[in-house]
UniProtKB/Swiss-Prot annotation:
Modified sites of kind Phosphothreonine: T140
Other information: Present with 2836 molecules/cell in log phase SD medium.
Region (Disordered): 99-118, 149-194, 227-292
Modification Phosphoserine occurs at: S26, S118, S134, S155, S156, S200, S216, S250
Protein's name according to its UniProt entry: DASH complex subunit ASK1
Keyword Nucleus found: yes
PANTHER family (alphabetical): DASH COMPLEX SUBUNIT ASK1
Subunit structure: Component of the DASH complex consisting of ASK1, DAD1, DAD2, DAD3, DAD4, DAM1, DUO1, HSK3, SPC19 and SPC34, with a stoichiometry of one copy of each subunit per complex. Multiple DASH complexes oligomerize to form a ring that encircles spindle microtubules and organizes the rod-like NDC80 complexes of the outer kinetochore. DASH complex oligomerization strengthens microtubule attachments. On cytoplasmic microtubules, DASH complexes appear to form patches instead of rings.
Compartment list: Nucleus; Cytoplasm, Cytoskeleton, Spindle; Chromosome, Centromere, Kinetochore; Chromosome
Species per Swiss-Prot/TrEMBL record: Saccharomyces cerevisiae (strain ATCC 204508 / S288c) (Baker's yeast)
A Gene Ontology term for the protein's cellular component: DASH complex
Major localisation: nucleus
């Protein structure tokens, strides 16, 4: 009984070992088939692509190295028109060599003493092209030396507004005859500015501001006399004649006019002489003429 049981166990173990070995063999065959059928072809194609990339990069490196040695003057003399295609192809091939030996030989032949001379000739041609007067693209416009000097308006003449600037023809016609008139206008402008400064200072001292032009009822006599005197000076000639006629025609003003003459004749005090002038009423606005 013991021997029979031992033989059965040995047969079972032998069968199990055989089954496992068959599984291992099948797995190895599958791996070999996968490597030979799928992996090896892909590796071969990848190696071919890498070789092509290496060749292309080597050619590009040679091309970029030789671009600095290209002689444009020699290649510009290629035939144009009905020239054969082979000659054009040969000239273009000379620009981009296919091997390093040809590149070195071309660099030796191109680097000669005539290269600097050709560059100088090219620069001269370009310079003559840009300096050619017959080219319309680089023709500059005519520049005139005549002009008109504009006179800036006076900043103090704000009431009269901006005056029209005389044209060049008018200034040419007037000529040198306006020299004295210009001097008189400058003097009158200076006088006007000085009067305005005095009045603004008086107003600022009285009210603390130079923008107020309305007198107060409590203005002292000195201030009223000064304002009336400045208003009398700034009136125009025509306005002075009309005002004098109106004053002389008025019976009230005529009554005041006679005491003034008597005061001048009798040499009375300054207070009585100034009392004959017309004093502006409180609330009136005084306008100063700035006409030249």
């Amino acid at each position: 009984m013991d021997s029979a049981s031992k033989e059965e166990t040995l047969e079972k173990l032998d069968q199990e070992i055989t089954v496992n070995l068959q599984k291992i063999d099948s797995n190895l065959s599958f791996c070999f088939h996968k490597i030979t059928q799928d992996i090896i072809p892909h590796v071969a194609t990848y190696s071919e692509i890498c070789e092509r990339i290496m060749d292309s990069t080597e050619w590009l490196g040679t091309m970029f190295q030789e671009t600095g040695l290209v002689n444009l003057q020699a290649n510009a003399a290629a035939p144009v028109g009905n020239a054969p295609v082979k000659s054009l192809v040969s000239n273009n091939v000379g620009i981009f060599p296919t091997s390093a030996e040809e590149a070195s030989r071309q660099s030796q032949t191109d680097n000669g003493p005539n290269e600097a001379d050709s560059a100088v000739h090219v620069n001269r041609d370009v310079h003559s092209m840009f300096n050619n007067d017959s080219i319309d693209d680089f023709h500059t416009a005519n520049i005139t030396s005549t002009g008109q000097i504009l006179k800036l308006p006076d900043s103090s003449d704000e009431d009269t507004g901006s005056e029209a600037v005389p044209s060049r023809e008018q200034t040419d016609l007037t000529g040198e005859g306006h020299g004295g008139a210009d001097d008189e206008q400058d003097e009158s402008t200076i006088q006007r500015q000085s009067r305005k400064r005095k009045i603004s200072l008086l107003l600022q001292q009285q009210y603390g501001s130079s923008s107020s032009m309305v007198p107060s009822p409590i203005v002292p006599n000195k201030m009223r006399k000064q304002l009336a005197h400045e208003e009398h000076i700034n009136n125009d000639g025509d306005n002075d004649d009309e005002n004098s006629n109106n004053i002389e025609s008025s019976p009230l003003k005529q009554g005041h006019h006679h005491p003034k003459g008597q005061a001048d004749d009798n040499n009375e005090g300054p207070d009585e002489e100034e009392s004959t002038k017309e004093v502006p009423k409180p609330g009136t606005i005084i306008h100063f003429s700035t006409n030249r």
